[in-house]
Curated annotation (Swiss-Prot):
SMART domains: PTB (SM00462). GO terms for cellular component: postsynaptic density. This is SH2 domain-containing protein 5. Gene3D superfamilies: Pleckstrin-homology domain (PH domain)/Phosphotyrosine-binding domain (PTB), SH2 domain. It comes from Homo sapiens (Human). May be involved in synaptic plasticity regulation through the control of Rac-GTP levels.
């Protein structure tokens, strides 16, 4: 029986931390977790996609609170009193989402666990925007953490890429090469006892104890391509009228600033080590476009480095950035089995977006990406919104032979089967 991590701790059990890093709080429903063992990275991704499809109608749900920061991701009970899971960012391998079924999932390993033993944690929301923002927050955290670790690979000063907006993508069809019987619902565990990957993580207390930023801070100054609602105020009012504002997904332009402030607090030494002047961290903070556009362009990092990282990402991962010195033209670089393949995207005289050598036209870049995420024959492979963490560490650096910590079981784990992750 595996007993690692810090599951089930109440905030009062650990005392208050002297400093609570800035975090972004979101709400979701936890479905469960399943193992992803003894597979290479791409096979693990295919398995996760298969399992998300198999579990799309799973009725098991548990309301939880997710807190994002540059240190990692913490999951609390719905009341905010019990810390269920806490994953250091360096132990999270992959993040993905499925808009059609309102699913968000990430793969992570436990402290001192081998790289071949991973768990996938699955969450759902009531609408696509709720889970999309969870995925975007985690992906941008990956990128900002990499930038802080590798300041020498930052992008040189150049015009900021135009916004591309947030895209509700459809799920990809399963890729070939991996066939495995889907997990049954009785094999999906909601016991998070052994699914925690922070080594030592103080609890943050009740909901609202962390620092929150006002919504007005860091509003985007750029107009969204292909979107007539260029004003954040108009976007928000439209969302309120359509009653889909609950998740706060339309406030994505503020999350970039919040994540960067979290980076400054979580890694003060690395932040201060950034060069001053053009291309320094002040330029990074002022890049306050939406999370989607910054993730697509890997904002802040040089293009050669971004392409090198793309070559190591999952099949279908992509970068989208405007061509330098060319108006109305973009480069879409896609990770395929043949390597990274570039495609030219342009805007025609009718204001519609097209991919070179293909007749289809789209009203926005978002629509173009959405189409090629579900169309298998238009490109070498469909686009995939999933992202690998470039700062992922396969093993922990610590004293050799140190046994994993053992903590008391969760109060809701009543049976031996639950403790083994089969309840």
């Amino acid at each position: 029986m595996q007993k690692a991590g810090a599951g089930g701790r109440r905030a009062s059990d650990c005392g208050l931390a002297p400093h609570r890093p800035r975090c972004i709080t979101k709400f979701a429903q936890y479905v469960g977790s399943f193992p992803v063992d003894d597979l290479d990275t791409q096979e693990s991704v295919w398995l996760v996609q298969q399992q998300l499809w198999a579990l799309k109608d799973c009725p098991r749900r548990r309301a939880v609170i997710l807190k994002f920061s540059l240190q990692g991701l913490k999951i609390y009970s719905g009341e905010g009193e019990v810390l269920l899971m806490a994953h250091a960012l360096r132990r999270i391998l992959y993040s993905t989402w499925c808009p059609a079924d309102c699913q968000f999932a990430f793969m992570a390993r436990n402290p001192r666990s081998p790289a071949s033993k991973l768990f996938c944690h699955l969450f759902v929301g009531s609408q696509p925007g709720e889970v999309q923002i969870l995925h975007l927050l985690l992906c941008r955290s990956f990128q900002l953490a990499y930038l802080l670790q590798h300041p020498e690979e930052r992008a040189q000063p150049e015009p900021c890429p135009g916004p591309t907006g947030e895209v509700p993508l459809k799920p990809l069809s399963s890729s070939g090469g991996l066939v495995r019987e889907p997990f049954g619902r009785d094999q999906l565990s909601q016991n998070v006892h052994a699914l925690v990957s922070f080594r030592r993580l103080p609890a943050e207390g009740l909901v609202g104890s962390g620092k929150e930023l006002p919504e007005s801070e860091g509003r985007a100054r750029h107009a969204r391509l292909g979107n007539p609602y260029c004003s954040p105020t108009l976007v928000r009012k439209k969302a309120i009228r359509s009653k889909v504002i609950r998740s706060g997904a339309y406030r994505g332009c503020t999350y970039e600033t919040q994540l960067q402030l979290s980076a400054r607090e979580a890694f003060p030494a690395a932040w201060e080590a950034w060069p001053r002047g053009p291309g320094g961290h002040s330029c990074l903070v002022e890049s306050e476009g939406s999370l989607t556009e910054n993730i697509w362009a890997f904002a802040g990092i040089s293009r050669p480095c971004a392409l090198a990282l793309l070559r190591r990402d999952v099949l279908g991962a992509f970068l989208l950035w405007p061509e330098l010195g060319a108006s109305g033209q973009w480069c879409l670089s896609v990770r395929t089995q043949c390597g990274v393949v570039p495609h030219q995207v342009f805007r025609n005289h009718l204001g519609r977006y097209c991919l070179e050598h293909l007749p289809a036209e789209f009203p926005s870049l978002e629509a173009l990406v959405e189409n090629h995420a579900v169309t298998e024959r238009s490109l070498f492979c469909p686009l995939d919104m999933g992202r690998l963490n470039p700062t992922y560490e396969e093993q922990d650096c610590g004293p050799p032979g140190r046994p994993p910590r053992t903590l008391r079981p969760l109060s809701h784990a009543k049976s031996e089967a639950e403790l083994q992750g089969l309840g």
